[in-house]
Amino acid sequence: MLPRVARLNTHLVSLALLGFQITYGAITYQHPDDLPSDVDYDFIVAGGGTAGLVVASRLSENPDWNILVIEAGPSNKDAPETRVPGLAGSLPASRTDWNYTTIPQDALGGRSLNYSRAKVLGGCSSHNSMVYTRGSKDDWNHWADITGDQGLSWDSILPVMKKAEKFSKDFSNQSVDGHIDPSMHGHDGLLSVVSSYTNVSFNDLLLETTKELSDEFPFKLDLNDGNPHGLAWTQYTIDHRAERSSSATSYLESTRDNVHVLVNSRVTRIFSAGNGTDFRSVEFAVDANSPKKVLTAKKEVILSAGVIASPQVLMNSGIGGREELQAIGVDTLIDNPSVGKNLSDQAATLLMFDTTLPNTDYDVAAALTEWEDSRSGPMAYGARLNHLTWVRLLDDKLNGSDPSSGKNSPHIEFQFMQISHQLPPADAPNQVKLPDPDSIGAVLLLAVVNLYSVSHGSIILNDNDPFANPMIDLNMFGDQKDIAILREGVRSARRMFSSQAFKDVVNGTVYPPADVTSDEDLDAFLRTSAISYWHGVGTLSMSPQNASWGVVDPDFRVKGTSGLRVVDASVIPYAPAGHTQVPVYTFAEHASVLIAKSYA
């Protein structure tokens, strides 16, 4: 999640990028009536997001299989703004967003939160901040233990991540010596990754801090080596041409013509044969007023609609808790109360420090023209600042309970965003008094993130209308441990910018005000300022075969069914130490192998 850049008229962006051509082997259809009537599909992928396009691409390697992808949003070809790295901050709440809102959060004083989810081919990989983080070794080893699939352990899964990755220098061909460990990366995969950076004075000061405060903020050569603790150069899913690399631009562009993609059509339900347990028929429509169509897969349906929509589709299909389904008038075919539960996300707050450092503001329209002309300039970068920091709290700050995956996992992330004259947007929570713009020169803006929330939320349906948004309850700060950890994160950030390196250029926080220091005052600030970091997972969690909890088995099959698997963020048991993009790609790569092997 990043603060939005100045809003651009998407029509003007489209005009500016009119000559921008995107090609791939898959055949794209704009309307259900356009689908060929003489093709029987072996696999139907319900959702063309990050995971769905990976699965479709990998299955297409078998030339005898025909695959159909059904995506609710438009093609990324029709949303060229998704290709420009510097426009990432303008995509939330745009035409390529579902624009979800949570229900009022009790621990936040009844505030509802915006909950951005992508509605475009490529899903969140076409829409996110492009940060490339794998999580910790502890995360993967713990996921392997709790799912019963040792194929997810770090040592087993690292080759999968490397296989998918194509690390290279960025458009500027700058050296990455001292920025990454080349041995930790793949160089021949489909997904482009760079470690692009700008030469701002802030970089040098941060690196000085890693020497002065090395216990809390050590320098980390590569944030993706499995032990993410310290300050590191950020890596992004951007290619060497300074364009976003998404599942649509990487995986889909490499597919064959045995993949058909239907955009602008929403999967509403998955039907079973004779109301039994074999689910292979997909119902879909353009909108609530359009006729519904049904297609049946010869082999399987792969549900890949995301952490919000996948449980919604299952519940509307009769898979969920019996009492909940009865309450909305849906017949229960598979009674599983775990469906829609266990929503795991990360809580964050923005911090602003008064600073005399040079600002990183730029003219967005001029920068877009520069990018369009030469694929260079501010729009070519993933962010205006170049580092992430991960902090592991001391045991005495955890009150005897460690929510992380293990001793090599951090509790807190700092994502440095920009140095700007702009204050938070008008729609940001501002019950805490914002500074007078005339009283400060510029502000250093960063996000402080609690990576491991103890509190889990849920997805619940209001009714059986498949086009109605579900109720999203993050249950943010439902457990007091979560706000306590984020509070310590704020204090950690203040220690960083009280270091000798910053003493002459950073003058303390203005959001929250510098005098907000006690537990009580910081908690009050966090209850009015906390936001979701939009890294939700877990609503259809994977669990061991025959477990009494969870929704999918380690082979990604929905428990108690045949013909139906789920492959997306919803199956990941809890959010990792970092961003969720790479785990979603990796789970999808892993699932693709398992699916293909089952038909070998």
Curated annotation (Swiss-Prot):
A Gene Ontology cellular-component term: extracellular region
Q: Name one Pfam family in it.
A: GMC_oxred_N
> Which co-factors does it depend on?
FAD
Q: Which UniProt keywords apply?
A: Carbohydrate metabolism, FAD, Flavoprotein, Glycoprotein, Oxidoreductase, Secreted, Signal
Q: Which GO terms describe its molecular function?
A: flavin adenine dinucleotide binding; pyranose dehydrogenase (acceptor) activity
* EC identifiers of the protein: 1.1.99.29
User: Which interval of the chain is the signal sequence?
Assistant: 1-25
Q: Provide the cofactor note recorded for this chain's UniProt entry.
A: Binds 1 FAD covalently per subunit.
Glycosylation sites recorded in the entry for this protein: N99, N114, N173, N199, N275, N342, N399, N507, N546
Its localization reads: Secreted
- Enumerate the catalysed reactions: pyranose + acceptor = pyranos-2-ulose + reduced acceptor; pyranose + acceptor = pyranos-3-ulose + reduced acceptor; pyranose + acceptor = pyranos-2,3-diulose + reduced acceptor; a pyranoside + acceptor = a pyranosid-3-ulose + reduced acceptor
Q: Please tell me where this protein is predominantly located.
A: secreted
Please give the family membership noted in the entry. Answer: Belongs to the GMC oxidoreductase family.
Quaternary structure, per UniProt, is:
Monomer.
Q: What does this protein do?
A: Catalyzes the single-oxidation or sequential double oxidation reaction of carbohydrates primarily at carbon-2 and/or carbon-3 with the concomitant reduction of the flavin. Accepts only a narrow range of electron acceptors such as substituted benzoquinones and complexed metal ions and reacts extremely slowly with O(2) as acceptor.
Protein name, please?
Answer: Pyranose dehydrogenase 3
Instruction: From the UniProt record, report the name of the gene that encodes this protein.
Output: pdh3
